[in-house]
């Protein structure tokens, strides 16, 4: 994203104070540094607090052109954005997938015009085929994990076909065989 490349310094406010949040923050730090952007601080937060003013003040004192908020939209992440906007600490936010949703723009509107985020997914042949199949079925394929959910359902279906039954044990016994080589690539829309 072009805005990402314009940043010189970035604060990273990681997801909840747990192993997932730490791992996600580590990935973001590596990506930011790979683009020549310095990281001014990386801090974790606890979910469920009523006020994140102290956390926002800590982030503001570290400085930066943008604040990466790697949290959950309707929990602490949204409150940290709100506190940052209210205090004038940051006006550009880099958002992880857990921070992206309609309630974000409903809550902050144009205040997020400089902000951007990332969603998991791929851009290969399978992604294009899935977008076509989803559109034909009236499904919005742009949401997080939509394509991956389709893939998971297809693997479960193929594992049941391979084992001849639809029970848990059959799926477990066959899923790795249908998901890995040798085999035939099956693209979205071809599972029946």
Over which residues does each language-model region extend?
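Extracytosolic ligand-binding ectodomains
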Residues: 5-9, 13-192
């Amino acid at each position: 994203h072009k805005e990402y490349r314009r940043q010189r310094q970035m604060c990273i406010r990681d997801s909840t104070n747990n192993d997932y949040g730490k791992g996600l923050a580590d990935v973001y730090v590596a990506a930011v540094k790979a683009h020549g952007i310095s990281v001014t601080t990386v801090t974790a937060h606890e979910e469920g607090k009523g006020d994140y003013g102290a956390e926002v003040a800590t982030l503001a004192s570290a400085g930066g052109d943008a604040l990466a908020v790697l949290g959950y939209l309707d929990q602490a992440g949204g409150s940290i954005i709100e506190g940052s906007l209210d205090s004038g600490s940051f006006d550009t936010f880099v958002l992880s997938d857990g921070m992206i949703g309609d309630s974000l723009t409903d809550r902050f509107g144009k205040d997020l015009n400089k902000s951007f985020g990332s969603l998991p997914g791929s851009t290969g042949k399978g992604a294009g085929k899935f977008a076509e199949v989803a559109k034909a079925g009236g499904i919005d394929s742009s949401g997080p994990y939509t394509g991956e959910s389709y893939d998971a359902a297809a693997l479960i279906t193929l594992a049941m076909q391979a084992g001849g039954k639809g029970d848990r044990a059959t799926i477990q016994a066959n899923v790795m065989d249908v998901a890995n080589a040798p085999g035939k690539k099956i693209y979205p829309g071809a599972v029946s």
